[in-house]
Amino acid sequence: MLNENEKENYYATMKILVSACLLGENCKYSGGNNYNQAVCDFARGHQVVPVCPEVLGGLPTPRCPAEIVQGVVTNKEGINVDREFRAGAAKALAIAKENGVGLAILQSRSPSCGVKEIYDGTFSGTKIPGQGVFAKMLMDEGIRVLDAGELPKIILKNEDGKCQSD
């Protein structure tokens, strides 16, 4: 078990995997990004490992939007892209493990990176509880995963001293 000084040093130098789109990289399906200032502020001072599992899986940017349909990643045109998503997730997981990542901050609702909810597979914008392919792989490996949308709440709670994130 780490003592208080060791904990402080560990968290000060923690390696954090971050969805590349959250850092401003134009790798989102639309060709844009999901730049998130709270994520950048939180990551400052840590070693950041940016990844986009979808790009690592060989998908182009921009690309047709995809959702998980009955457990299979399928794009809006009905094309099965599950192999690309799973290959990219496996490559991103290998990067996380090679770098000794202790925490991952991922883009909300993505079929790769959704942490607590994803789109329901109807391409209607309806969300359901669930995890993206990459988020689930990280969780299965015991790597702590946070949804980028929850980060501001976690930071505020910690600054108030009322509670810490799970």
Residue positions per predicted region:
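Short, surface-exposed acidic-centric catalytic microdomains
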Residues: 34-75
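Divalent-metal-activated hydrolytic enzyme cores
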Residues: 6, 11, 26, 56, ...
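Extreme N-terminal starter segment of soluble prokaryotic enzymes
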Residues: 12-16
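Short amphipathic alpha-helices and their capping/turn segments at secondary-structure boundaries
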Residues: 6-9, 35-48, 88-103
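Short N-terminal binding/cap micro-motifs at the start of the first secondary-structure element
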Residues: 24-31
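Short, active-site-adjacent cap segments at secondary-structure transitions
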Residues: 24, 57-59, 111-114, 153
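Short, well-ordered beta-to-alpha junction loops that form the rim of enzyme active sites
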Residues: 21, 107-110, 150
